[in-house]
Amino acid sequence: MNARSTGQHPARYPGAAAGEPTLDSWQEAPHNRWAFARLGELLPTAAVSRRDPATPAEPVVRLDALATRLPDLEQRLEETCTDAFLVLRGSEVLAEYYRAGFAPDDRHLLMSVSKSLCGTVVGALIDEGRIDPAQPVTEYVPELAGSVYDGPSVLQVLDMQISIDYNEDYVDPASEVQTHDRSAGWRTRRDGDPADTYEFLTTLRGDGGTGEFQYCSANTDVLAWIVERVTGLRYVEALSTYLWAKLDADRDATITVDQTGFGFANGGVSCTARDLARVGRMMLDGGVAPGGRVVSQGWVESVLAGGSREAMTDEGFTSAFPEGSYTRQWWCTGNERGNVSGIGIHGQNLWLDPRTDSVIVKLSSWPDPDTRHWHGLQSGILLDVSRALDAV
Protein backbone atom coordinates (compact mmCIF):
# COMPACT_ATOMS: atom_id res chain seq x y z
CA MET A 1 0.00 0.00 0.00
CA ASN A 2 1.37 3.42 -0.95
CA ALA A 3 1.81 5.97 1.80
CA ARG A 4 -0.16 9.16 1.25
CA SER A 5 1.97 12.25 0.67
CA THR A 6 1.59 14.91 3.34
CA GLY A 7 3.08 17.61 1.14
CA GLN A 8 5.82 18.16 3.74
CA HIS A 9 9.45 17.13 3.95
CA PRO A 10 10.40 14.63 6.67
CA ALA A 11 11.37 16.15 10.00
CA ARG A 12 15.07 16.96 10.28
CA TYR A 13 15.20 15.23 13.66
CA PRO A 14 12.66 13.42 15.88
CA GLY A 15 10.15 15.88 17.29
CA ALA A 16 11.08 18.76 15.00
CA ALA A 17 8.24 20.73 13.44
CA ALA A 18 8.03 20.76 9.67
CA GLY A 19 10.57 23.17 8.22
CA GLU A 20 12.48 23.59 11.48
CA PRO A 21 15.11 24.65 12.19
CA THR A 22 15.26 27.72 9.97
CA LEU A 23 18.06 30.24 9.44
CA ASP A 24 16.55 32.25 12.28
CA SER A 25 16.08 29.43 14.79
CA TRP A 26 18.95 26.97 14.38
CA GLN A 27 21.08 28.60 17.11
CA GLU A 28 18.27 28.29 19.68
CA ALA A 29 17.29 25.35 21.89
CA PRO A 30 16.16 22.68 21.17
CA HIS A 31 17.26 22.98 17.54
CA ASN A 32 20.91 23.75 18.31
CA ARG A 33 21.57 20.23 19.59
CA TRP A 34 20.84 18.95 16.08
CA ALA A 35 22.20 21.93 14.14
CA PHE A 36 25.60 22.19 15.82
CA ALA A 37 26.32 18.64 14.62
CA ARG A 38 24.68 18.95 11.18
CA LEU A 39 25.43 22.50 10.10
CA GLY A 40 26.29 21.48 6.56
CA GLU A 41 22.64 20.55 6.04
CA LEU A 42 21.63 24.16 6.74
CA LEU A 43 24.44 26.44 5.59
CA PRO A 44 26.95 26.41 2.73
CA THR A 45 30.25 24.99 3.96
CA ALA A 46 33.69 24.34 2.52
CA ALA A 47 36.07 21.55 3.48
CA VAL A 48 39.24 22.37 5.41
CA SER A 49 41.32 19.55 3.98
CA ARG A 50 43.44 17.26 6.10
CA ARG A 51 45.21 16.32 2.80
CA ASP A 52 46.11 12.70 3.61
CA PRO A 53 43.63 9.79 3.61
CA ALA A 54 41.67 9.41 6.82
CA THR A 55 42.85 6.88 9.37
CA PRO A 56 40.52 4.33 11.02
CA ALA A 57 38.82 5.67 14.13
CA GLU A 58 40.13 4.52 17.49
CA PRO A 59 37.69 2.91 19.94
CA VAL A 60 36.05 5.19 22.47
CA VAL A 61 37.78 5.50 25.85
CA ARG A 62 35.22 5.92 28.63
CA LEU A 63 35.37 8.11 31.74
CA ASP A 64 36.69 5.32 33.99
CA ALA A 65 40.12 6.91 34.51
CA LEU A 66 38.47 9.89 36.20
CA ALA A 67 35.65 8.05 37.97
CA THR A 68 37.39 7.66 41.34
CA ARG A 69 38.09 11.36 41.81
CA LEU A 70 35.06 12.66 39.91
CA PRO A 71 32.25 10.11 40.38
CA ASP A 72 29.61 12.63 39.27
CA LEU A 73 31.41 13.71 36.09
CA GLU A 74 29.03 12.03 33.66
CA GLN A 75 26.04 13.58 35.42
CA ARG A 76 27.66 17.02 35.24
CA LEU A 77 28.39 16.56 31.55
CA GLU A 78 24.76 15.66 30.93
CA GLU A 79 23.52 18.61 32.99
CA THR A 80 25.62 21.01 30.91
CA CYS A 81 24.26 19.76 27.57
CA THR A 82 27.53 18.14 26.54
CA ASP A 83 27.67 16.57 23.09
CA ALA A 84 31.33 15.51 23.19
CA PHE A 85 34.00 15.55 25.90
CA LEU A 86 37.60 14.36 25.66
CA VAL A 87 40.72 14.40 27.81
CA LEU A 88 44.06 14.01 26.02
CA ARG A 89 47.12 13.57 28.26
CA GLY A 90 50.33 13.55 26.30
CA SER A 91 49.44 11.45 23.27
CA GLU A 92 46.94 9.26 25.15
CA VAL A 93 43.18 9.75 25.11
CA LEU A 94 42.47 9.30 28.80
CA ALA A 95 38.69 9.76 28.81
CA GLU A 96 35.83 10.41 26.40
CA TYR A 97 32.10 10.99 26.53
CA TYR A 98 29.60 11.29 23.69
CA ARG A 99 25.90 11.89 24.17
CA ALA A 100 23.42 9.48 22.64
CA GLY A 101 23.22 10.09 18.91
CA PHE A 102 26.65 11.75 18.67
CA ALA A 103 29.66 9.72 17.50
CA PRO A 104 33.42 10.26 17.77
CA ASP A 105 33.66 10.96 14.03
CA ASP A 106 30.82 13.52 14.08
CA ARG A 107 31.85 17.11 13.54
CA HIS A 108 30.56 19.78 15.92
CA LEU A 109 30.34 23.53 15.47
CA LEU A 110 33.13 25.26 17.42
CA MET A 111 31.60 28.73 17.46
CA SER A 112 34.32 31.12 18.71
CA VAL A 113 36.90 28.43 19.37
CA SER A 114 37.29 29.06 15.63
CA LYS A 115 38.95 32.35 16.60
CA SER A 116 41.84 30.53 18.25
CA LEU A 117 42.42 28.59 15.04
CA CYS A 118 42.52 31.82 13.05
CA GLY A 119 44.93 33.36 15.54
CA THR A 120 47.19 30.34 15.06
CA VAL A 121 47.23 30.80 11.27
CA VAL A 122 48.09 34.47 11.75
CA GLY A 123 50.88 33.40 14.12
CA ALA A 124 52.32 31.10 11.46
CA LEU A 125 52.36 33.97 8.96
CA ILE A 126 53.96 36.32 11.49
CA ASP A 127 56.64 33.69 12.08
CA GLU A 128 57.26 33.58 8.32
CA GLY A 129 57.59 37.35 8.19
CA ARG A 130 54.58 37.71 5.91
CA ILE A 131 52.60 39.68 8.50
CA ASP A 132 54.13 42.36 10.71
CA PRO A 133 51.94 42.63 13.82
CA ALA A 134 53.02 46.23 14.37
CA GLN A 135 51.79 47.35 10.96
CA PRO A 136 48.36 48.97 10.61
CA VAL A 137 45.58 46.77 9.31
CA THR A 138 45.13 48.99 6.26
CA GLU A 139 48.68 48.20 5.16
CA TYR A 140 47.30 44.79 4.21
CA VAL A 141 43.63 45.58 3.52
CA PRO A 142 43.34 49.14 2.16
CA GLU A 143 39.62 48.55 1.62
CA LEU A 144 39.22 49.13 5.37
CA ALA A 145 40.36 52.77 5.13
CA GLY A 146 37.75 54.99 6.77
CA SER A 147 36.49 52.16 9.00
CA VAL A 148 37.32 51.52 12.66
CA TYR A 149 40.28 49.46 11.39
CA ASP A 150 41.95 52.51 9.83
CA GLY A 151 44.76 53.06 12.33
CA PRO A 152 44.89 50.05 14.70
CA SER A 153 47.68 47.52 14.31
CA VAL A 154 47.35 43.85 13.50
CA LEU A 155 48.40 43.02 17.08
CA GLN A 156 45.64 45.23 18.50
CA VAL A 157 43.16 43.29 16.38
CA LEU A 158 44.63 39.98 17.54
CA ASP A 159 44.33 41.05 21.18
CA MET A 160 40.90 42.68 20.66
CA GLN A 161 42.04 46.04 21.97
CA ILE A 162 39.97 48.27 19.69
CA SER A 163 37.04 50.46 20.73
CA ILE A 164 34.36 49.60 18.20
CA ASP A 165 30.65 50.27 17.76
CA TYR A 166 29.70 46.59 17.80
CA ASN A 167 27.09 45.10 20.11
CA GLU A 168 27.86 41.40 20.69
CA ASP A 169 24.39 40.64 22.11
CA TYR A 170 23.53 37.38 20.38
CA VAL A 171 19.78 37.60 21.03
CA ASP A 172 19.24 41.27 20.09
CA PRO A 173 17.96 41.50 16.49
CA ALA A 174 19.27 45.08 16.27
CA SER A 175 22.81 44.14 17.33
CA GLU A 176 25.81 44.33 15.03
CA VAL A 177 26.58 40.68 15.70
CA GLN A 178 23.23 39.70 14.17
CA THR A 179 23.88 41.95 11.16
CA HIS A 180 27.25 40.22 10.90
CA ASP A 181 25.49 36.83 10.97
CA ARG A 182 23.05 37.90 8.26
CA SER A 183 25.86 39.17 6.04
CA ALA A 184 27.60 35.81 6.42
CA GLY A 185 24.47 33.79 5.66
CA TRP A 186 23.84 32.62 9.21
CA ARG A 187 20.46 34.34 9.41
CA THR A 188 17.80 35.50 6.97
CA ARG A 189 18.96 38.65 5.21
CA ARG A 190 17.11 41.95 5.61
CA ASP A 191 16.78 44.87 3.23
CA GLY A 192 19.79 47.14 3.59
CA ASP A 193 22.12 44.49 5.01
CA PRO A 194 25.68 44.43 3.63
CA ALA A 195 25.97 42.03 0.71
CA ASP A 196 28.67 39.87 2.31
CA THR A 197 31.19 39.73 5.14
CA TYR A 198 33.79 41.85 3.38
CA GLU A 199 31.30 44.67 2.88
CA PHE A 200 30.05 44.37 6.47
CA LEU A 201 33.57 44.84 7.85
CA THR A 202 34.01 48.10 5.91
CA THR A 203 30.90 49.57 7.60
CA LEU A 204 32.19 49.31 11.18
CA ARG A 205 33.04 52.48 13.06
CA GLY A 206 34.42 53.44 16.48
CA ASP A 207 35.91 56.28 18.47
CA GLY A 208 39.51 55.50 17.52
CA GLY A 209 40.44 54.22 20.97
CA THR A 210 42.85 51.32 21.46
CA GLY A 211 44.50 49.54 24.37
CA GLU A 212 41.39 48.33 26.23
CA PHE A 213 39.86 44.91 25.67
CA GLN A 214 36.56 44.74 23.81
CA TYR A 215 35.44 41.37 22.56
CA CYS A 216 34.33 41.71 18.93
CA SER A 217 33.81 38.84 16.50
CA ALA A 218 34.43 41.11 13.52
CA ASN A 219 38.11 41.37 14.50
CA THR A 220 38.70 37.72 13.63
CA ASP A 221 37.19 38.09 10.18
CA VAL A 222 39.49 41.06 9.59
CA LEU A 223 42.40 38.79 10.49
CA ALA A 224 41.14 36.21 7.99
CA TRP A 225 40.95 38.92 5.33
CA ILE A 226 44.59 39.80 6.08
CA VAL A 227 45.48 36.09 5.78
CA GLU A 228 43.85 35.98 2.36
CA ARG A 229 45.65 39.11 1.23
CA VAL A 230 49.18 38.02 2.20
CA THR A 231 48.85 34.39 1.04
CA GLY A 232 46.72 34.79 -2.07
CA LEU A 233 44.60 31.91 -0.76
CA ARG A 234 40.99 31.77 0.33
CA TYR A 235 40.85 31.61 4.12
CA VAL A 236 39.59 28.02 4.02
CA GLU A 237 42.65 27.04 1.95
CA ALA A 238 45.03 28.89 4.27
CA LEU A 239 43.48 27.22 7.33
CA SER A 240 44.16 23.86 5.69
CA THR A 241 47.69 24.71 4.54
CA TYR A 242 48.97 26.34 7.71
CA LEU A 243 47.16 24.27 10.35
CA TRP A 244 44.79 21.45 9.51
CA ALA A 245 46.95 19.54 7.02
CA LYS A 246 49.75 19.36 9.62
CA LEU A 247 47.69 17.89 12.46
CA ASP A 248 47.29 14.30 11.20
CA ALA A 249 43.57 14.89 11.70
CA ASP A 250 41.09 12.04 11.43
CA ARG A 251 38.73 14.08 9.23
CA ASP A 252 38.52 17.25 7.22
CA ALA A 253 37.11 20.16 9.17
CA THR A 254 34.46 22.36 7.57
CA ILE A 255 33.78 26.08 7.68
CA THR A 256 30.66 28.00 6.72
CA VAL A 257 31.09 30.40 3.79
CA ASP A 258 29.17 33.44 2.62
CA GLN A 259 28.04 34.03 -0.96
CA THR A 260 31.55 35.15 -1.94
CA GLY A 261 33.12 31.99 -0.48
CA PHE A 262 34.67 33.86 2.47
CA GLY A 263 35.07 31.52 5.43
CA PHE A 264 33.37 32.63 8.66
CA ALA A 265 36.63 32.62 10.62
CA ASN A 266 35.18 33.98 13.84
CA GLY A 267 32.81 31.09 14.50
CA GLY A 268 32.11 28.84 11.53
CA VAL A 269 34.51 25.90 11.89
CA SER A 270 33.22 22.40 12.66
CA CYS A 271 35.40 19.40 13.48
CA THR A 272 35.51 16.30 15.66
CA ALA A 273 36.43 16.49 19.33
CA ARG A 274 39.47 14.31 18.70
CA ASP A 275 40.75 16.58 15.95
CA LEU A 276 40.21 19.70 18.05
CA ALA A 277 42.28 18.05 20.78
CA ARG A 278 45.10 17.77 18.23
CA VAL A 279 45.16 21.57 18.01
CA GLY A 280 45.66 21.74 21.77
CA ARG A 281 48.32 19.04 21.59
CA MET A 282 50.21 21.09 19.01
CA MET A 283 50.15 24.11 21.33
CA LEU A 284 51.44 22.13 24.33
CA ASP A 285 54.13 20.62 22.10
CA GLY A 286 55.56 24.06 21.45
CA GLY A 287 53.87 24.60 18.10
CA VAL A 288 54.91 21.30 16.52
CA ALA A 289 52.40 18.87 14.98
CA PRO A 290 52.95 15.46 13.32
CA GLY A 291 53.11 17.15 9.92
CA GLY A 292 55.66 19.76 10.95
CA ARG A 293 55.93 23.03 12.82
CA VAL A 294 52.76 25.16 12.84
CA VAL A 295 53.90 28.14 14.93
CA SER A 296 57.11 29.01 16.72
CA GLN A 297 57.90 28.14 20.32
CA GLY A 298 57.95 31.88 20.95
CA TRP A 299 54.39 32.28 19.67
CA VAL A 300 53.16 29.51 21.96
CA GLU A 301 55.01 30.99 24.92
CA SER A 302 53.37 34.36 24.25
CA VAL A 303 49.94 32.73 24.36
CA LEU A 304 50.66 30.72 27.52
CA ALA A 305 52.12 33.79 29.25
CA GLY A 306 48.85 35.65 28.75
CA GLY A 307 48.10 39.18 27.67
CA SER A 308 47.63 42.50 29.42
CA ARG A 309 45.68 42.14 32.66
CA GLU A 310 45.26 45.90 32.75
CA ALA A 311 43.51 45.83 29.37
CA MET A 312 40.99 43.13 30.38
CA THR A 313 37.51 44.56 30.96
CA ASP A 314 35.33 41.44 30.67
CA GLU A 315 33.77 41.19 34.13
CA GLY A 316 32.25 37.80 33.41
CA PHE A 317 35.68 36.35 32.73
CA THR A 318 37.53 38.15 35.52
CA SER A 319 34.87 37.18 38.06
CA ALA A 320 35.97 33.58 37.49
CA PHE A 321 39.63 34.33 36.75
CA PRO A 322 40.75 37.58 38.45
CA GLU A 323 44.15 37.50 36.73
CA GLY A 324 42.61 36.71 33.35
CA SER A 325 43.59 38.25 30.03
CA TYR A 326 43.16 37.79 26.29
CA THR A 327 45.90 37.50 23.70
CA ARG A 328 46.32 36.25 20.14
CA GLN A 329 42.70 35.05 20.04
CA TRP A 330 43.02 32.93 23.21
CA TRP A 331 41.53 33.41 26.68
CA CYS A 332 44.19 33.16 29.42
CA THR A 333 43.04 32.43 32.96
CA GLY A 334 46.17 33.67 34.75
CA ASN A 335 45.51 31.04 37.41
CA GLU A 336 48.12 28.96 39.19
CA ARG A 337 47.78 26.19 36.59
CA GLY A 338 48.33 28.47 33.61
CA ASN A 339 45.14 27.30 31.91
CA VAL A 340 44.48 28.79 28.48
CA SER A 341 41.32 28.25 26.47
CA GLY A 342 39.56 28.77 23.20
CA ILE A 343 35.95 29.55 24.12
CA GLY A 344 32.74 29.56 22.08
CA ILE A 345 29.15 30.38 22.93
CA HIS A 346 26.71 27.60 23.81
CA GLY A 347 29.49 25.73 25.65
CA GLN A 348 32.48 25.13 23.37
CA ASN A 349 35.93 24.83 24.98
CA LEU A 350 39.45 23.87 23.96
CA TRP A 351 41.20 23.89 27.35
CA LEU A 352 44.96 23.60 27.83
CA ASP A 353 46.40 22.42 31.15
CA PRO A 354 50.18 22.84 30.90
CA ARG A 355 50.73 21.51 34.43
CA THR A 356 49.62 18.00 33.45
CA ASP A 357 50.44 18.30 29.73
CA SER A 358 46.75 17.75 29.02
CA VAL A 359 44.09 19.01 26.65
CA ILE A 360 40.38 18.99 27.48
CA VAL A 361 37.73 19.42 24.80
CA LYS A 362 34.10 20.08 25.69
CA LEU A 363 31.54 20.63 22.91
CA SER A 364 28.01 21.46 23.99
CA SER A 365 24.63 22.86 23.00
CA TRP A 366 23.59 25.04 25.92
CA PRO A 367 20.07 26.48 25.58
CA ASP A 368 21.50 29.98 26.20
CA PRO A 369 24.43 31.37 24.24
CA ASP A 370 26.43 33.10 26.94
CA THR A 371 25.51 33.42 30.62
CA ARG A 372 27.52 33.41 33.84
CA HIS A 373 25.44 30.48 35.08
CA TRP A 374 26.51 28.19 32.24
CA HIS A 375 30.09 29.47 32.17
CA GLY A 376 30.35 28.85 35.91
CA LEU A 377 29.25 25.24 35.53
CA GLN A 378 31.57 24.76 32.56
CA SER A 379 34.61 26.28 34.26
CA GLY A 380 33.94 24.16 37.32
CA ILE A 381 34.08 20.97 35.27
CA LEU A 382 37.24 21.98 33.42
CA LEU A 383 39.05 23.00 36.60
CA ASP A 384 37.95 19.91 38.51
CA VAL A 385 39.10 17.62 35.70
CA SER A 386 42.43 19.46 35.52
CA ARG A 387 42.97 19.00 39.26
CA ALA A 388 41.96 15.35 39.07
CA LEU A 389 44.66 14.84 36.44
CA ASP A 390 47.29 15.77 39.04
CA ALA A 391 46.69 12.38 40.63
CA VAL A 392 46.08 10.26 37.52
UniProtKB/Swiss-Prot annotation:
Q: Does the keyword S-adenosyl-L-methionine apply?
A: no
Q: What is its EC number?
A: 3.5.1.46
Reaction(s) catalysed (UniProt annotation): [N-(6-aminohexanoyl)](n) + H2O = [N-(6-aminohexanoyl)](n-1) + 6-aminohexanoate; N-(6-aminohexanoyl)-6-aminohexanoate + H2O = 2 6-aminohexanoate
- Determine the domain of life of the protein's source: Bacteria
| EC class | hydrolase
Its annotated pathway reads:
Xenobiotic degradation; nylon-6 oligomer degradation
Catalytic residues, chain numbering: 112
Keywords, alphabetical: Hydrolase, Nylon degradation, Plasmid
Molecular function per GO = 6-aminohexanoate-dimer hydrolase activity
Function, as annotated, reads: Involved in nylon oligomer degradation.
The entry's other comment says: The EII enzyme is 100 times more active toward the substrate than the EII' enzyme.
For this entry, the protein name equals 6-aminohexanoate-dimer hydrolase
Q: What is the lineage of its organism?
A: Bacteria, Bacillati, Actinomycetota, Actinomycetes, Micrococcales
Query: Which gene underlies this protein?
Result: nylB
